[in-house]
Amino acid sequence: MSLETVVEDIRDEARERAKEIRADADERADEIVAEAEADADDIIADAEAEVTAEIDQEREQQLSSAELEAKQMRLEARRDALQSVRSAVEDRIVALDGDEREELTRELLDAASTEFDGADTVRVFGRADDEALISEILDDYDGYEYAGEYDCLGGVVVESDASRIRVNNTFDSILADAWENNLKAISARLFDEEQ
């Protein structure tokens, strides 16, 4: 074997080895590129999922906020309607006159007077416009006197030093109790709801 043949064999081996190294390097480079592309796809998918989740969350928050605002507006409209009804009732109570007003005032005074049996002096307060009516009714009660004005729709507030009791039998207090006890029914009827 000549030196040239040996050199040629070494060169062939070196070429073969270089070819293998290049093939391994190309294969490894392809693997690295594939991994990088897969990682990039995962990163993009994660980012898209995160953005989608944020968009969904923002949409839900805006929807919830809008629903809450609408509910508050409905409740406010209901409150306004109920207040309007109550104001109308108060106006009708204030407008009561004649025998009907006298009968109701007398019943409220009778109910209050049971708390003051045996009291020497009983003071009765009422609406300024009802002074004459209350004074006339008090003529039937010994020891009772009209003591002045009380800001109310009608009825009486009765008190005595002897018993240290004050009874509020005004139309306002009766209306407040009736309103509270029947608010659900009033609301249901006003807004056509089933109870």
Curated annotation (Swiss-Prot):
Keyword Protease appears in the UniProt entry:
no
Does the keyword section mention Cell membrane? Answer: yes
Q: Which InterPro entries match?
A: ATPase_E_C, ATPase_V1_Esu
Provide the membrane topology annotation. Peripheral membrane protein
A Pfam family annotated for this chain is vATP-synt_E
Give the subcellular location: Cell membrane
* Superkingdom assignment: Archaea
List the coiled-coil residues. Answer: none
Name a single GO cellular component: plasma membrane
What keywords would UniProt list here? ATP synthesis, Cell membrane, Hydrogen ion transport, Ion transport, Membrane, Transport
What GO molecular function annotations does the UniProt record carry, in alphabetical order?
Answer: ATP binding; proton-transporting ATP synthase activity, rotational mechanism; proton-transporting ATPase activity, rotational mechanism
Q: Name one GO biological process term.
A: proton motive force-driven plasma membrane ATP synthesis
Q: Which family does it belong to?
A: Belongs to the V-ATPase E subunit family.
Q: What does this protein do?
A: Component of the A-type ATP synthase that produces ATP from ADP in the presence of a proton gradient across the membrane.
What's the subunit arrangement here? Has multiple subunits with at least A(3), B(3), C, D, E, F, H, I and proteolipid K(x).
Q: Which PANTHER family match?
A: ATPASE H+-TRANSPORTING V1 SUBUNIT E1A-RELATED
State the name under which the record lists this protein.
A-type ATP synthase subunit E
Organism of derivation = Halobacterium salinarum (strain ATCC 700922 / JCM 11081 / NRC-1)
Gene name? Answer: atpE
